[in-house]
Every structure is written in structure tokens, then in C-alpha cells.
Amino acid sequence: MSAKKKDLLSSAMKRTSEWISSQEVSSDVTVHVGEASFSLHKFPLMSKCGFIKKLVSESSKDSDSTVIKIPDIPGGSEAFELAAKFCYGINFDMSTENIAMLRCAAEYLEMTEEHSVENLVVRAEAYLNEVALKSLSSSITVLHKSEKLLPIAERVKLVSRCIDAIAYMTCQESHFCSPSSSNSGNNEVVVQQQSKQPVVDWWAEDLTVLRIDSFQRVLIAMMARGFKQYGLGPVLMLYAQKSLRGLEIFGKGMKKIEPKQEHEKRVILETIVSLLPREKNAMSVSFLSMLLRAAIFLETTVACRLDLENRMGLQLGQAVLDDLLIPSYSFTGDHSMFDTDTVQRILMNYLEFEVEGVRLSNNGVDLAGDMERVGKLLENYMAEIASDRNVSLQKFIGLAELIPEQSRVTEDGMYRAVDIYLKAHPNMSDVERKKVCSLMDCQKLSREACAHAAQNDRLPVQTIVQVLYYEQQRLRGEVTNDSDSPAPPPPQPAAVLPPKLSSYTDELSKLKRENQDLKLELLKMKMKLKEFEKESEKKTSSSTISTNPSSPISTASTGKPPLPRKSFINSVSKKLGKLNPFSITPYNGRGRTKPPKDRRHSIS
């Protein structure tokens, strides 16, 4: 049919539709759309809707009135009403709120050029291309409305066009986008500068209305156009805060969430974690801690939780105490309040990153300061969890063993944690109290801490004697230094190290790094051994066969402390201790060196 004939036919149909409306001709077709019913006329509908034309021709011709049902039209009765108005020539407004359902309904009803000139499909496409997809906020609105119109919105490529328009315009608006990729080595420096003053673009709040799958596709399209991944941090933070709102991740109450809603939030969280920037300092530790709490609460995949733990370990030097106080979310009374196992894994990750940083960087001052901050943080954390009576001795000692020895200038923080733990667990045996007190080096206690420890009746006698002995040695040294204080030697010119001494220093630093590596390997083996022992205990307790009284489990049930056993870890530790020719004390499994005994003043 030629274009001229189509125009003539369209004009005739329009005049006929207007005449039907003006003369109030009785309806001859009833259309049921969901729960709504429309009494209409066949001619205006069939002249523009190929789908209705098929339904009318297939219906019975005997009856004067035809009844047809359209149960699954996109947009429901609202969309069909607008399409019917278009068929009758009644004016209505197209907007960003209704253009998505109009376009999908027109596709469903087959309102194409084959049936009428300038039909609804063409009119809707013109509005999309000329108005809706020309602004960022309108494109986001159309995409949001299209989420309820799948799969037909995908078929007409409405979703993909909206996503492409959003990605293009966000890259034009934001300063995080550059067509050429910058040097990857400079990423960390840039992120450190951005993290101090995070920039949130005006469109970030608009993106939070999207469903998680649409949100993910938009961010991926933005990165494909050159948007820097570390610039997505504020956007992800806004989306997570809005979508995960209402979760009881800071309390210890029972879960108050429906299974369906829990599944939806779990998918949202796992997707957000997969989109997090890989650069260091791109996200704050507090935000990562919030995500980790939610991941434990929602029981996400293990990979999701381990990813968050690795990220927190990488930035542990920036954390505060509240970031580590993660509830255990165990709803039985025999579990500790805080999840110490998670913190233990975070600290393990931190130690691995620090060892790798020592190898790759010569800036030892920054690493030492960072490690000192982590040491103080862990001491405060241990003091916080020490008051919990459900924290076992094994967990308390295991955490203390992981605190780097070089990070603790004084032992006051560890003494405070030990004292709180002894006060909260008054029924411990003498052997157990000695184990707890062996975590601190009495030689590094300050004068105030020594004065408190000397009068602390919760400490074992041996520990009090050590404190008094070292305090006596300190006073004796101070008196000797005051009486025999020589004149300061004249300043000497800086001497250049001889080649032999320089090589000796290099060898010594190399051996120190090797010792640190061996410590980490031992800690990993201990963690694996503890997990294996926990699994074997669970299997033994669940079996119906009676346990052998001589087994370690039956010994623990009698209430008596188990005898020390020779394990593979202990044997490896003793062998590794002999590898160091410079008498650098290797990691002894407790994170502390025992004070040397003075045979003339030994009391034990």
C-alpha cells in the first residue's frame, strides 16, 4: 500500500472514530484487562491494533457483542486505557512516567505502521529519542519504569538504550571519567587524595531507585566508557545504605526479616561487594565493616565474606574499635557476644599484606607506625571482649598471639586486657591464669602498671614476683646511671660502614624477613589445625558411639586441664628456632619472649 493511500485511510479512520464518539454509538466489543472492563467499538481498535484485530476475527460472529480478554498486557489496564484513547483520537500527555509502558503496550498490541500511519509505536519512539533519552534524570526514570515491563522492554531494546544513555551522560558529567586509562601505578595515590574528600555527584542519588540488576548493568556500562572504578565508591555507598536499611546488624536480637526479603537483600549485598573498587583506600573501613556485618547477618556466600575480610585487612591501620566489634549473630546463650574468629582472619590478612609491603617497599617508617596503630587497636579490642564470660581461653590466647611483637612499645594495653579477663573469669585454675599472664612481657610494663600489678591479687604469684623483680632492676639501673653519668662524648663524624659490616646488615635484614615469613606460615598451620580439631569434635559429638575415656574430649569434659601434647606445630617451631644464627627469637606461638632468668636472683 502506498504512503498516499495510507494517509487517506488513516484520515478516514480518524473521522469515523470521532463520529462514533460524538454520536454515542453503542459498544460492540468488551475488553477485559485484568480486573478492569472496557466497553468499546471494534472499528477504532481494529484499525490501529493488529493484536485486537486477530482476537476479534477469531471470536464467534454469531453474537452482536464480542468479549475478548487481554490478561497480560504490559502496564495493565492503565496502559490499555491510554492505547484505547489513542485509537479514538483522544488527546493525552506523554511523559517520562508513562512512555515506557506506552511503548511496550504498543508493541504488545501491534500498533505499528502496517496498520496505521503514525501509529503509537512511531509516536512513542519519537518521544523517547527526542525527549526522554536526552536528559540523565529522564533516562533513569524510564529505566526504572521499564523494570516492571520485562521481558518486552528488553525485546524492544528499551532497557539497553536507557543504560547506554545513562552511561554516556554520567561520563560527561563526572570528573572520574577519562577516555585514556591512566597509569595503574598512580591509582593508590589518587585514591588516597580522593578518600579525604569524597565527591558525590548529583546523579548518584537518582541511581539508587534502580533495581540491583539494572544498577549493576549501568555501572558496568559506565566503566566500559572509561569511568574510573574507584569513583564508584560514593555511588555504591549510597545504594548500600538505602537498600540495606532496616537490617539489625548492630544488635544481637533475633532476625526479624521475611525469607523472601532476606534473599533479595542477600543478592543486593553480594552484587555490591562484587562491584567494589579494588584500589586501596577507595572505601572507608567503617563502610567495609558495615558490609561485613550485613554479610554475616544475611549469611552470604563464603567468597563474599572473605573478600570483605581481605579488604579490611588491607586497611586495618585506619580502623577504629567499633569497626572490629562485630556481633556474633548467634542466637544461643552459650556463644560470645563478638565474632572473634572473623577478627582473627582479618588480622591474619593484615599480617600477610604487611610482610608483602616490607618486601616491595623500603619505607619502613610508615609500616612501623601503621603496625603500632594496629597493635594498640587489637589491645583495645581484647580489653573489650575480655569482659565476656563466653570468650574461651583458647580464643583469647589465639588473638593475643597474632598481635605483632614489634607493634607494642609497652605492655600496658595487654596488661589491661589480661586483668579484665581474669576478673571476668574468676574460676580459672592456676595453670590457666599462668597461660593468660604469659601473654604479656612484664619487663615492658610502665611504672604505673607495675605498681598496679604488684597489688593485684588476681595475678599468679609468679607473675607478681616477675613484676617486682623487673621494677627492682629498673630502679637499680636508674640509680647507677644517676651516680655514674659520664660526660657526653664529642660528636664524631659520620662513619661509612665497612663492606663486611654492610653485608652483615643486609644478611640480618634478610633473615628477619625470612623469620617473619616463617611466623606467618606457622600461624596459618595453627589456624588450619584448629579448624580441623573443631570439625573432628563436631563429628565425635554427633556420633552415637560412646567416646573413649582416654580421648582429649573426655578429658575436657571432666573439668580438668588437658595435658600438653606434642604436636606437629610445636616440633616445627622448635626446628625453625634453630635456623637463625644471629639469635633473633622466632615466633614462639605466644607472641611473647619469656624474660631471661637471673640465676643469682632466681626465685623459682
Curated annotation (Swiss-Prot):
Phosphotyrosine: modified positions: Y415
Keyword line: Coiled coil, Phosphoprotein, Plant defense, Ubl conjugation pathway
InterPro entries in the cross-refs: BTB/POZ_dom, NPH3/RPT2-like, NPH3_dom, SKP1/BTB/POZ_sf
Gene3D superfamilies tied to this protein: Potassium Channel Kv1.1, Chain A
Subunit record text: Interacts with CAMTA3 and CUL3A.
Signal peptide residues on this chain, from the entry's feature table: none
Domain of life: Eukaryota
Domain BTB as annotated: residue spans: 27-96
Biased composition (Basic residues): 591-604
Function text: Acts as a substrate-specific adapter of an E3 ubiquitin-protein ligase complex (CUL3-RBX1-BTB) which mediates the ubiquitination and subsequent proteasomal degradation of target proteins. Involved in disease resistance. Acts as a substrate adapter that recruits CAMTA3/SR1 for ubiquitination and degradation during pathogen infection. Acts as a positive regulator of plant defense by removing the defense suppressor CAMTA3/SR1.
Involved pathway(s): Protein modification; protein ubiquitination
Bias (Low complexity) ranges: 541-558
An individual GO BP term: defense response to bacterium
The record's note on its domains: The BTB/POZ domain mediates the interaction with some component of ubiquitin ligase complexes.
Coiled-coil portions: 500-541
Stored SUPFAM superfamilies: POZ domain
Name by which UniProt lists this protein: BTB/POZ domain-containing protein SR1IP1
GO cellular component: plasma membrane
Knockout consequences: No visible phenotype under normal growth conditions, but mutant plants exhibit enhanced susceptibility to the bacterial virulent pathogen Pseudomonas syringae pv tomato strain DC3000.
NPH3 domain location: 201-474
Chain segments carrying region Disordered: 478-499, 532-604
Family: Belongs to the NPH3 family.
